């Protein structure tokens, strides 16, 4: 049976494999997602300059949902999309962070798409 340590190491290895292929620019930044047990985090990153352009998470003050469920993840997706559109960013590259595209990760992506991001 897999232990939690094995799972996190496997996720990190998957993420490194994916990161070899996915790259964000200023025109099309990388939408990076991280999921913990209690919260979910999303940020748009310009990999050329190594800067975070926009960030949103369920741990922010003023967040109305619960970060450990799908509804909260969808709200975070909408929040990051609204902040990105304010800065004039519409197209992004989605980086699931080594997590399976299912559940909270999928809901965050759908929330960002509904709010206007294109990926």
From Swiss-Prot:
One example GO MF annotation: 5S rRNA binding
Gene Ontology annotations for the cellular component aspect, listed alphabetically: cytosolic large ribosomal subunit
Family matches, as InterPro entries: Ribosomal_uL18_bac-type (IPR004389), Ribosomal_uL18_bac/euk (IPR005484)
GO biological process: translation
Keyword match Endoplasmic reticulum: no
Alphabetized UniProt keyword annotations: Ribonucleoprotein, Ribosomal protein, RNA-binding, rRNA-binding
Record note on quaternary structure: Part of the 50S ribosomal subunit; part of the 5S rRNA/L5/L18/L25 subcomplex. Contacts the 5S and 23S rRNAs.
Protein family according to the UniProt entry: Belongs to the universal ribosomal protein uL18 family.
PANTHER family: 39S RIBOSOMAL PROTEIN L18, MITOCHONDRIAL, LARGE RIBOSOMAL SUBUNIT PROTEIN UL18M
NCBIfam families reported in the protein's UniProt record: L18_bact (TIGR00060)
Function comment: This is one of the proteins that bind and probably mediate the attachment of the 5S RNA into the large ribosomal subunit, where it forms part of the central protuberance.
Identification of the protein by name: Large ribosomal subunit protein uL18
Organism: Clostridium botulinum (strain 657 / Type Ba4)
């Amino acid at each position: 049976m897999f232990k939690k340590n094995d799972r996190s190491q496997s996720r990190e290895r998957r993420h490194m494999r994916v990161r070899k292929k996915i790259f964000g620019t200023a025109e099309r930044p990388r939408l990076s997602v991280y999921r913990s047990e209690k919260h979910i985090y999303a940020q748009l990153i310009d990999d050329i300059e190594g800067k975070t352009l926009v960030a949103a998470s369920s741990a922010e003050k003023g967040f109305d949902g619960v970060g450990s469920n799908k509804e909260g993840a969808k709200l975070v997706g909408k929040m990051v999309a609204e902040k990105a559109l304010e800065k004039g960013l519409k197209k992004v590259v989605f980086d699931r962070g080594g997590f399976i595209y299912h559940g909270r990760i999928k809901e965050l992506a759908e929330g960002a798409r509904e709010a206007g991001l294109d990926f």
